[in-house]
Amino acid sequence: MAWFDDTYYFEQAQLRIAHITDCHLFSDKQGEYFGVNTAEHFTRALTDIAKQQPDALIFGGDLTQDHSFNSYLLFAELIHNSDLDCPVFWVPGNHDEIDQLNLISGGQIQRAKHIVAQGFELILINSKGNTPAGWVTPSHLEEIMACLVDSDNRHIAFCHHNPLPINGYLDKHMLENGPQLLNLLVNNGRVDALFHGHVHNDYQQQFRELDIYATPASSVQFTKHSATWQQEDKGAAYRMLHLNAEQQKVHIRTDVVWLNE
């Protein structure tokens, strides 16, 4: 099956989307990443997200830290035990294995990478490369182009890796062909924004007329604009998107939610 073959449909022209990323789970609930219990942080974020009553949750990658299959099972357990009643979608991070993500998909956790609402669509891009850095393969770029040209709707894109430098330590692991992907999205003329994770903090950038948003991690944050790898426990975080299609435009309102504030 090609990446975008499975499509999920919403009938409405307004969506509330929760974007949560980089939970870095372990095989058990006591695992800690830089002193942070990642399962506790993720659970706390899911509890708060459920109160927002989103239409969908998009997980932005880096589910696992110890690369165990039990960490994937823990992710599914925490989702299923939460108060969330919406579908959950995902993109793979550099820590993740797509086959393992597919194994926990089914029911509430969806495999679909193409989400269609009235007047706009969401595309979930695979930026996982052979190294911690990101790479969108030539064949996947063709799939993205085909998905975009197949519809006159507005589009919003999601991937894991940052496509532009953030002037920080993780730039060495950014999306290596980020400008190529961004030019494809901008040149299409119907893509309004791209959302990503990976950098463990919130950023807002622009490439030509495309808005780019980084969502902070649900686990631990990496200090902004630091050439060395510095961590901060600022509490669990996620992003909410309020999307509204009107007169061949999609209006985007987005806010980061910091649970320690």
Swiss-Prot record:
Binding site residues for Fe cation 2: 62, 94, 160, 198
Binding-site residues, AMP: 24, 62, 94-95, 200
Cofactor(s) annotated in UniProt: Fe(2+)
Enzyme class: hydrolase
Binding annotation for Fe cation 1: 22, 24, 62, 200
Cofactor note text: Binds 2 Fe(2+) ions per subunit.
GO MF, any single term: nucleotide binding
Keywords for the protein's UniProt record, in alphabetical order: Hydrolase, Iron, Metal-binding, Nucleotide-binding
One of the Pfam families matching this protein, by short name: Metallophos
The enzyme's E.C. designation: 3.1.4.-
Family: Belongs to the cyclic nucleotide phosphodiesterase class-III family.
Protein's name according to its UniProt entry: Probable cyclic nucleotide phosphodiesterase PSM_A2567
Species of the source: Pseudoalteromonas sp. (strain SM9913)
